[in-house]
Amino acid sequence: MAILEEKAAVIPPGGMAVAGRLDRSVRSRLGEICAGRGASLLVLGEDLSLLEDPREPVFDLYTPWSLYTNLRLTVLGHYQRGNAAVAIGAAEAFVGGPLDRAQVRSALLAVRVPGRLEVISDRPLCILDGAHNPAGMAEMVRSLDYLLDRRRVLGVVSILRDKGALEMLNSLSPRCDILFVTQNSNPRSYPADELANLAEGLENKPKVFLDADPRSALRSAYKLATSNQVVLVTGSLYLVADIKRSLESHPRP
């Protein structure tokens, strides 16, 4: 709730707030804040509605101002559709009316989100995703279910101390054959050995390998990955940044 209070501080009196899907308590509190400031509130799932099949590439969006059909994103991740819906709703609120449908379609096709289900190689298939809290990890894993079907994961993982590491590992581990536990460059990163101890205590734990050097951990994952496995770097945007920097001069780990 503290995060909500911080973000809601920017809502101006008499303005409008646009939000994604919210749990009941957060939705209630945001409604109270907006009412207290005389601000309007649009919420995905209430005022903004996605008409979609997660396995299909196109989706439609209903807003208070318009209907946008045959929308398509090139970025991976089912949750990105919700992000797109909120962005469209916010743009409509800003201009006070509907947007040009052709321009909306074109803009969505041009969206790029580095570090979010970003594919950096295909042999083996390697994906970077900066999911860095329990909700983000759970959403990312749901996206993997759609994208990868039954393919198993070799996870290269590092998590910050204050981000709910155990809950994140519990979400990720059922998809993994191996977890390569490492450590990112942020001082708040879990030391690799402590994070590995958490992983070893999981109820349905995969094999756990400890390697405090992210590039070395990724190299090990590449070596062990079979054609039916996917290498996934996740748990922290700092880890994703560390890996991307290390690959700038040497594209293969």
Where are the predicted features?
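Nucleotide phosphate-binding/pyrophosphate-handling subdomain across enzymes
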Residues: 2, 64-178
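Active-site catalytic pocket residues across diverse enzymes, especially alpha/beta-hydrolases
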Residues: 94-95, 144, 199, 203, ...
